[in-house]
Amino acid sequence: MFRRFATTALFTTLIMTKPVHAQGITKDHHDGARFKNPWPSFVSYGFIDAFKMLTGSDKSVMSAAKPTDMPEKVDINWNLLKEKDDCKLHATWLGHACIFLQMKGFNVLLDPVFSDRCSPVQFAGPKRYTDPPCKLEELPKIDAVIISHNHYDHLDVDTIKKLSTAHPNCKFYVPLGNKAWFNLSRPLDSEGNDRVIELDWWESANIKNDTGELKFTCTPCQHFSGRGLMDRNKTLWASWCIESVTGVAKVFFGGDTGYRTVPIKTKPELQYDVDYLDTLPHCPAFKEIGEKIGPFDLALIPIGAYSPRWFMSPIHCSPEDAVELHRDIKSKHSIGIHWGTFVLTDEPVFEPPKRLKAAMERRGLDVEDFNVLPLGGTFSISI
């Protein structure tokens, strides 16, 4: 399965062409040409490392078979999705990292991907083994779309085009450098793409309507970007914080992130050992987010696509990492995302929620404070 991830990535880089990126001043996370993860918790691996993994003695075995086990799926509660209740916060899981968030009179869609494959083409690349719980056209009015980064399983041109047509007043919030993709790919129907708001880490933008106002803050995470051969890390990746301006409710969206790097030669029995993992450098950004913006009423944290651990750990949380992130940002309740939709890596389909439950128990935490939703399921809290 890891070979599927690696070969798809290679295929993707070969067919894409013109890079898009931001020309910015030098910062800790930007050298003026490319973005970077400015922490000891990140180690960069490339195609040479992937090739070694594919051809080495411990290479992964790829199976093209569709998983036989499926995540639980429920019918969407459309009455809930269409209600206007300023005192409730609703989050509905639509598959992978996509969440339909209802908060203070706003409908916000996070990392929407409704295509059959997360790929530059629809005849090759990772194919979803669980269908979305609804059609994109069935969703209520969308006020805002938030994108975490430009990988194909988080930014899908066909989905963006459909959203643009169906919701002409919708705004798109993206990390620095990604507005250029909208100009190049032209997924929106408006000239100049003034509907796209581009932010750097720790920059914020507000959205208002007749009932209230939300603040979107682009915050750090540990990942990378790229849709083609020449554009690796030329656009920024981000987590996001969504707040009501009155401070009544706060939501964290992790998008796609790593937490620490498990060294290549780590023994298999130590790769998920909490005592050993605690000795490794971890990304300090999440504690900073917790201190500056937290605590959060709800956090949406990735828990899947983490094996083989040495290769995926810098960019993808394991469930054990996700629990530490949950604690760092001071989340009152968290939902696991980024699993149960595409087979991208080696771990069994149902392993992420099982490991998540075990990791919560190991830390002495209430397993109900960080769990997963069924596909189409909604988590609701009063705010």
Which residues does each PLM region occupy?
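Long, hydrophobic, well-ordered secondary-structure blocks that form the structural core
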Residues: 143-144, 149, 158-207
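Active-site metal-binding motif and surrounding structural segment of the metallo-beta-lactamase
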Residues: 123-174, 291-300
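Binuclear metal-ion centers of metallo-dependent hydrolases, dominated by the metallo-beta-lactamase
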Residues: 186-211, 290-292, 307-383
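Active-site-proximal loop/helix segments of hydrolase catalytic cores
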Residues: 158, 225-329
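Active-site environment of divalent metal-dependent phosphoester hydrolases
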Residues: 151-155, 179-182, 203-206, 224-226, ...
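Active-site neighborhood of phospho(di)ester-bond hydrolases with catalytic His/Asp-centered motifs
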Residues: 109-111, 141-151, 173-175, 252-257, ...
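Metallo-beta-lactamase
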Residues: 2-138, 243-255, 297-298, 304
